[in-house]
Amino acid sequence: MKPLVKKMLTVVLCASTLTAPLFLTGCSVSKVANSVQQGVQKKSQDDVKVFNNYIKAVGDFNSHTVRFGYAIGPDIQKLREGQHLTSFMAPHFDSLQKNLQAAKDAGVPYDDMKEPLDKVLAVLKDIVPVASELDTYYETNSYQADNYAKEQQLGPKYVQLYDQFYAAYNQLDAVIHKHNTENQQAHLKELKESGKKNAAAAQEVHLRLTALLDGFEEGKQIDVNAANQELQGIMDVSNSITSPEYNSTKNSLNTAIGRIRTFLGDQTNDHYNDMVESYNRFIGSMNRLDMNKLDK
């Protein structure tokens, strides 16, 4: 379950959206996170806005992919195994290509983003037309006319490009995740130094919950006792927030924690997906929260 994507915005506070790009081989996890106000680490507002372009691009892509993972996952698996399809769904490669290219045209905020970004765009240039052709092929039932001839031609090519895409995409994620984490941690420090106890606690809750889920890596045994202890610690911090403005977010947090504990007790794909969805709802609540009101 390696984190796939992080997101940083310039408003309200740092928050994340957890999504899963695939439900085929383990528990890939991605996140979309928000950071606040004036771009920590002394970055200008323009730099933050440029970074946000990438955040929105990958956030939209991941949201669609997890929403329709029930179809995307089985389709790529069947093509990988040489099975015939009668319908087809791919991630929104075309939208991602358009949005990432627009983001690149506006600027690249970190030097170490340039190479992985170019790799992703290069694969997208190849996979977008193949995915589009397959989509039309199945939508028009052309497989009935050619007895799956085009599927046999394009299916293996699509699978190969699909794997190349995620190999490149995960590299881009790692860089975005690194910078976003640094910015969020710096912002937490700012909140603490400015005496905004409730806002700092809300930010700490988000960061600790995100770090916990980051640790649920595919193929790595989870220390369930340690995870439950950390969840209790997160709840303790949440309970220290005295502002009623946090109540709705706290309810979403408690639900997410419950789903995480269910997953820890029985680590199935269904429980994992429930955990991801409840985490998304918690972050949705965080993104609607006005952090400035927490310490008034």
Question: Across the structure, where does each feature detected by a protein language model lie?
Answer:
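C-terminal motif of bacterial Sec signal peptides marking the signal peptidase cleavage site
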Residues: 22-26
